[in-house]
From Swiss-Prot:
It comes from the Eukaryota. PANTHER family: SECRETOGRANIN III, SECRETOGRANIN-3. The keyword Secreted applies. It comes from Danio rerio (Zebrafish). This is Secretogranin-3. Keywords: Cleavage on pair of basic residues, Cytoplasmic vesicle, Membrane, Secreted, Signal. GO terms for cellular component: extracellular region; secretory granule membrane; transport vesicle membrane. It is found in: Cytoplasmic vesicle, Secretory vesicle lumen; Cytoplasmic vesicle, Secretory vesicle membrane; Secreted. Residues 1-21 form the signal peptide. Residues 22-126, 208-287 are annotated as: Disordered. The lineage of its organism: Eukaryota, Metazoa, Chordata, Craniata, Vertebrata. Its main location: cytoplasm. The gene is scg3. InterPro entries: SCG3. Residues 63-74, 235-259 have a biased composition (Acidic residues). It is a peripheral membrane protein.
């Protein structure tokens, strides 16, 4: 019995020794083996494969550092090449631009400029003024200064002939918050000065070129009117012939003849030979601008003596100056074209009235004149008047002598007002033109002088206020 127990102990000891000599596999290994033998769902297998792939593709930190160092070397070489290229081209770049370029070069993701350098369509102007990217630019790329903006606004106002352009521009700037109210007021003064300088400059440049531009169309129109309009003299001759052939209606032809003689007497100085006077103009005498002033031209023709030579030249100079002056004022909008035409028409008409006044003629149109019955008598009367006028002017050496104007004899009106203003203008020109020429006139003194004269005429009732304002506006625009 004891031997059986001993044998059981020996067997138990051997079994325990065998277990210690051959250890069993660890738990995780046994679990892995079981995972290999078990069949997993397809979705789980795909997810495990993806996780393993991501784990294997992840770069190690040493490799990342090596890549960054290579990128920095390439960026540095590119920066050196770009700087050498810019130094060869001598392109001015500000310090702030260099700082930005340096910051951009260190970033490997910012390589746009390098690509642009190889673009043949780029001329480098995009980066020339990087220090002020939001400034206004001209067409050549240069920054637009405040003076340039003022000049451009003035040019726009002058081209469109509309001062509302400035209001529209300023209102937009104010709405956008680009300028303040005080800056808008300053801008208004600067634009006004620039506009005035522009008008003055263009007036000086175009005054000579505009002397023979404004009237050719009117000349052709007036010539056509003269051809289409029957002459009063020819109508009167036809009526004389009809009167000789028809005595039965003697009373009616006599009344018509009386009216024709009245019209002829009124027009003997102003309109009978307008076309003939215009045809008599010689291009060599330099009086083409005076072709629409028949009365004045006839006056010059009468001053053909040697003694009246100086008087003739003075009158021509004054008349041409006034014509150019009116044309310039019409061109730049100081007066309307209608006012300019009225000014010139009244000027020629008042020359005739003043001449008749000097000759002792009545200023009012003749309403009752006995019929002459012959056109030849009208020619004789015209020649007689011309001869008397020549003798009268031989004794007149000063064209600015105080004479009684139409405004002092007849009722005041625009014609008399303009003539009186012109007479004062001539007096001033005579007084200030003793040693210099017409380019040496002090126009500011002339403007002040005319303002005083116009105010005195308004106070005396010679001028209406609106007429005085027109004259002031003419001289104030100089």
């Amino acid at each position: 019995m004891a031997s059986k127990r001993l044998g059981f102990v020996v067997v138990l000891a051997l079994v325990c020794q065998h277990i210690n000599a051959f250890p069993t596999p660890a738990g995780p290994d046994d679990k892995y083996n079981r995972e290999l033998t078990e069949e997993k769902p397809l979705e789980q297998q795909i997810a495990e494969a993806d996780s393993i792939r991501k784990t294997e593709s992840k770069p190690t930190p040493p490799a990342e550092e090596e890549t960054n160092s290579e990128d920095d070397d390439i960026t540095f070489l590119k920066a050196l090449a770009e700087k050498s290229k810019e130094s060869n081209n001598e392109t001015p770049i500000s310090d702030s631009a260099n700082e930005r370029l340096g910051a951009d070069d260190t970033d490997s993701t910012k390589n746009r400029r390098l690509a642009d350098d190889y673009d043949s369509t780029k001329n480098g102007m995009d980066y020339k003024y990087q220090d002020d990217p939001e400034s206004f630019r001209q067409l050549d790329g240069t920054p637009l200064t405040a003076q340039d903006i003022v000049q451009k606004i003035a040019n726009k106002i002058y081209e469109e002939d509309d001062r509302g352009v400035f209001d529209r521009i300023v209102s937009k700037l104010l709405k956008l918050g680009l300028i303040t109210d005080s800056q808008a007021e300053t801008l208004e003064y600067e634009v006004a000065e620039a506009l005035q300088d522009l008008i003055t400059k263009n007036a000086k440049d175009n005054m000579i070129g505009d002397r023979s531009v404004d009237y050719p169309v009117s000349a052709a129109k007036d010539t056509q009117d003269e051809e289409d309009r029957p002459s009063p003299r020819f109508d009167e001759e036809d009526e004389v012939e009809n009167e000789g052939g028809d005595d039965a209606n003697g009373d009616e032809p006599q009344e018509e003849e009386s009216r024709d003689d009245t019209v002829r007497s009124d027009d003997s100085w102003d309109a009978v030979s307008d076309g003939n006077d215009r045809n008599e103009l010689n291009p060599e005498d330099g009086l083409q601008d005076l072709q629409f002033f028949p009365n004045f031209y006839r006056l010059l023709k009468s001053l053909d003596s040697e003694q009246d030579k100086e008087e003739r030249e003075t009158l021509i100079t004054i008349m041409k100056t006034l014509i150019d002056f009116v044309k310039m004022m019409v061109k730049y909008g100081t007066i309307t074209p209608e006012e300019g035409v009225t000014y010139l028409e009244n000027l020629d008409a008042m020359i005739a009235l003043q001449t008749k006044n000097k000759l002792g003629k009545s200023l009012v149109p003749l309403s009752i004149t006995p019929p002459t019955g012959k056109a030849a008598d009208d020619d004789d009367n015209t020649k007689t008047e011309a001869a008397k006028m020549q003798k009268e002017y031989e004794s007149l050496k000063d064209s600015t002598k105080d004479v009684q104007t139409a405004a002092e004899i007849s009722h005041p009106g625009k014609s008399e007002s303009y003539l009186e203003a012109i007479r004062k203008n001539i007096e001033w020109l005579k007084k200030h033109n003793k040693e210099g020429n017409k380019e040496d006139y002090d126009l500011s003194k002339l403007r002040d002088f005319m303002d005083q004269q116009v105010d005195s005429y308004i106070d005396k009732g010679i001028l209406e206020k609106d007429e005085g304002d027109v004259i002031k506006r003419i001289y104030g625009s100089l």
